[in-house]
Regions:
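Glycine-rich phosphate/pyrophosphate-binding beta-alpha loops
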Residues: 56-67, 108-110, 139-140
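Peripheral (often C-terminal) accessory segments that flank ATP-dependent C-N-forming ligase machineries
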Residues: 81-178
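Alpha-helical context
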Residues: 4, 19-21, 51, 55, ...
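Internal nucleotide-binding/catalytic subdomain
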Residues: 1-64
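A sequence-level detector of short, solvent-exposed, charge-rich linear segments
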Residues: 35, 43, 71-74, 94, ...
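Gly/Ser/Thr-rich active-site loops/lids in small-molecule metabolic enzymes
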Residues: 5-18, 61-81, 117-133, 176
Length: 178
């Protein structure tokens, strides 16, 4: 996952809002179930225009990690404004840098995968400037970090461009061993 995407321009954003998001919100209201909260729209951009794949009433994973890395506004402020119905009064501020997340998955994922394998090098990776390591499927046991799930770690890098963020993320990934 990475942000910003070169696909999103004003025309596409308007099309998504007019043909996907707004009809959904209006439909929920018409059904007597107005929604206030996080609404993640999984979209695919095709030659025929944007297509809705899924909605989730939560942040997307791993899509959320690079977005939150670029967000300069306090996320709690945005969530509180959402809950209080005043989100239109808050303008989020974003870093001009790009952010990219590499998902480190257990061998065999999404099928059967090994659990309990030791992970080393996370601290070394996280020490790289512009890197954040998000834990997904990990646990600590007897002072060791162990893989517990299919998607184990999300290594997120921020840099001036997506290409630089990708390079930085993979340098960090190379420090992690399990």
């Amino acid at each position: 996952a990475f942000t910003p995407t070169p696909l999103l321009n004003d025309t596409l954003a308007k099309e998504v809002m007019e043909h996907i998001i707004e009809p959904t919100i209006k439909g929920l209201i018409a059904d007597g179930t107005p929604y206030q909260g996080v609404l993640y729209a999984g979209l695919m951009v095709t030659e025929e225009g944007p297509k809705l794949i899924e909605y989730n009433c939560r942040f997307g994973d791993p899509e959320c990690q690079p977005l939150m890395t670029r967000l300069e506004t306090d996320a709690l402020e945005l969530l509180l404004a959402t809950a209080e119905g005043r989100l239109d009064k808050v303008k989020p501020k974003w870093s001009k840098h790009a952010a990219l997340t590499v998902v480190m998955a257990a061998k065999g994922y999404p099928g059967s995968y090994e659990k309990g394998t030791e992970i080393k090098g996370v601290e070394e990776a996280a020490a790289i400037d512009g890197i954040t390591v998000f834990h997904a499927g990990t646990r600590r046991e007897n002072g060791k970090l162990l893989a517990q799930g299919g998607r184990v770690l999300n290594v997120t890098a921020m840099a001036p461009s997506v290409k630089e963020a990708q390079e930085k993320a993979y340098v960090a990934v190379s420090k992690i061993d399990w």
